Amino acid sequence: MRGTVVVAEDDPGLREVLLHVLHEASYQVHLVSSQADTLGTLRRLGARCLLVLEARLADGASEAILQALAAEQPPLECPVVLLSSSAVETRSANVVGVLRKPFELTRMLAVVKAFCPSPALPPSPARGSAPAAA
């Protein structure tokens, strides 16, 4: 498993496509479609994930989510990639990229790979050495 991605998108078709593509690339994916679900999931996961965020969810603009992340104590500093069909301006330091709809899935995956860290894997034993006894 590479890392964890939270996808906040209110279009069910696009959500499912992103789920499939990210699962195929070995990411753990959490799908949400509202501001409340997005914030709840991020609070539960902490800053150990990447948020792929629709700029305008059905229940409000992404700016409210970005402000809520900054207001958390301590602030939730997860990287955010915005999805938008129009130009987006934001002052949030969390926003690391914007993907303009429609976007190529390969481009989206490249952006996710750039900002979603892989979990640390334990080092493999040196060749020819026996595993340590417990």
Name every feature range the model reports, one short phrase each.
Residues 3, 62, 91-100:
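As written
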Residues 9-10, 54, 101:
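Acidic di-acidic motifs
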Residues 12-30:
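Two-component/phosphorelay signaling modules centered on CheY-like receiver
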Residues 33-50:
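Acidic, metal-coordinating helix/loop segments flanking the phosphotransfer/catalytic sites
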Residues 49-76:
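Conserved phosphotransfer microenvironments
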Residues 78-84:
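Hydrophobic/aromatic residues positioned on beta-strands within the core alpha/beta folds
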Residues 103-116:
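C-terminal output helix
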Residues 113-134:
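The C-terminal output helix
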